[in-house]
């Protein structure tokens, strides 16, 4: 009987799952990352899960933009929010005052080994309100100037180091566009995505910031004439034929990759497109990418950051034990963000950007210095991805670029539209 009992107990034990399975913690993750970004993030999540048997990230990708942020807010209200999510830092000025994000305490950050000095200063500041940290930056992503080395060399605009020369200062830049046009080798010297507000906001805000101007100053929208000057500069590129009129995102890229445009302003997220085309022999020229030249007097470039944050929920606050695990995940993701850099993004974690592997990654390492002069969207509820400023840019800046509004009139109408929403 004793023997049979021992056999029965042994059999029961054998059927039990490993002890580690009992200790596994499930973490719910939401992001909005598609395309190449999505592929890279899924690979990072898989690697984390494979190397952390006691933690399992269950990831869901939702629709980018307003649908994502609306879903976060409504889910948190009823206690069905994720444990961790990606969040654009340009949305923090809207999210923090409305209580959407849960702040991290100094003790929580210290216990996880997360230190301010290890992160890009501009990005860390964007996550900090009233000395409270509401998220941890993952990258800095910005716009850059893509260029065709063959065309620039023929126009006398390429240095021996393979980098453009003679582009700083608006007069010099416009003269360079004319030199490129004079070669007769391209349809456009500069390709811009001129039919959509988001893309044009990034260029407009860059030129505005390069004048040392603010989009919002106290209660004023676009004080002074800096906004009109920035918009007039962009409109001139279109009216002179340097840049295309009312062209879609895909077509603006195709102009550059087909060799029909010598330069192209777009986000760093298109770096993988260029890398893949060249690798597969489908790009008929050598290319590079640099930070936007200083055209208006001060080096500055629009930027945003992907970050990690915890939704705030009064209905079902996250448990302290899960906060600890979430911070462990965030720390790991940043320590392994070199693979994220291959998407064109600049890692916000300085030990990665200081690494030998990153400094040898081109053209990323060349334009990475833009993080030091990055300018985030205004600290306002009007700002941020898919916010009112983006909509106003679509309604007023885009028509001005394409000859449907005078730049000064467009700026005045933009002021009135946004002032009513402040």
Residue spans for each PLM region:
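Extracytoplasmic "Venus flytrap"
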Residues: 26-43, 62-65, 141, 195, ...
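Extracytoplasmic/periplasmic substrate-recognition and gating elements
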Residues: 50-51, 56, 155, 232, ...
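Short, well-ordered beta-strand elements
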Residues: 24-34, 55-60, 84, 134, ...
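Helix-loop-helix "hinge/cap" segment bordering the ligand-binding cleft or interdomain interface
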Residues: 50-51, 56, 108-112, 128-199, ...
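Extracytoplasmic "Venus flytrap"/periplasmic binding protein-like
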Residues: 43-47, 51-119, 154-156, 262-263, ...
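Short, polar/charged alpha-helical segment
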Residues: 34-56, 393, 411
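Hinge/lid segment of periplasmic solute-binding proteins
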Residues: 88-144, 174, 188, 200, ...
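Long, aromatic- and glycine/proline-rich binding clefts that accommodate carbohydrate-like moieties
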Residues: 122, 287-292, 342-399
């Amino acid at each position: 009987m004793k023997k049979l009992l021992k056999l029965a107990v042994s059999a029961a034990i054998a059927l039990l799952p490993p002890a580690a399975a009992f200790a596994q913690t499930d973490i719910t993750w939401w992001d909005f990352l598609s395309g190449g970004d999505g592929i890279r993030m899924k690979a990072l999540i898989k690697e984390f899960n494979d190397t952390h048997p006691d933690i399992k990230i269950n990831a869901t990708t939702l629709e980018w933009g307003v649908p994502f942020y609306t879903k976060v807010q409504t889910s948190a209200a009823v206690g069905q929010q994720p444990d961790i999510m990606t969040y654009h830092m340009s949305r923090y000025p809207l999210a923090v005052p409305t209580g959407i994000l849960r702040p991290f305490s100094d003790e929580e950050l210290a216990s996880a080994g997360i230190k301010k000095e290890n992160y890009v200063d501009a990005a860390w500041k964007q996550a900090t309100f009233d000395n409270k940290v509401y998220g941890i930056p993952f990258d800095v992503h910005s716009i850059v100037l893509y260029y065709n080395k063959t065309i620039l060399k023929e126009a006398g605009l390429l240095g021996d180091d393979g980098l453009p020369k003679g582009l700083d200062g608006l007069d010099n830049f416009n003269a360079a566009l004319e030199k490129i046009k004079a070669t007769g080798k391209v349809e456009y010297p500069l390709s811009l995505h001129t039919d959509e507000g988001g893309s044009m906001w990034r260029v407009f805000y860059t030129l505005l910031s390069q004048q040392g101007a603010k989009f919002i100053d106290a209660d004023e929208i676009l004080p002074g004439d800096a906004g009109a000057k920035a918009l007039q500069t962009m409109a001139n590129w279109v009216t002179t034929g340097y840049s295309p009129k009312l062209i879609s995102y895909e077509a603006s890229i195709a102009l550059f990759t087909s060799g029909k445009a010598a330069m192209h302003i777009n986000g760093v997220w298109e770096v993988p497109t260029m890398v893949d085309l060249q690798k597969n022999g489908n790009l008929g020229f050598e290319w590079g990418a640099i930070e936007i030249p200083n055209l208006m007097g001060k080096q500055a470039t629009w930027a945003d950051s992907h970050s990690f944050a915890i939704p705030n929920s009064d209905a079902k606050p996250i448990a302290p034990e899960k906060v600890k695990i979430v911070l462990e995940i965030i720390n790991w993701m940043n320590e392994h963000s070199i693979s994220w850099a291959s998407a064109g993004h600049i890692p916000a974690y300085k030990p990665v950007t200081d690494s030998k592997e990153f400094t040898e990654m081109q053209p990323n390492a060349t334009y990475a210095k833009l993080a030091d002069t990055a300018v985030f969207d205004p600290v306002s509820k009007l700002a941020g991805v898919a916010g009112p400023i983006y909509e106003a840019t679509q309604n007023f800046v885009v028509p001005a670029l394409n000859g449907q509004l005078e730049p000064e009139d467009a700026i005045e109408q933009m002021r009135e539209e946004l002032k009513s929403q402040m």
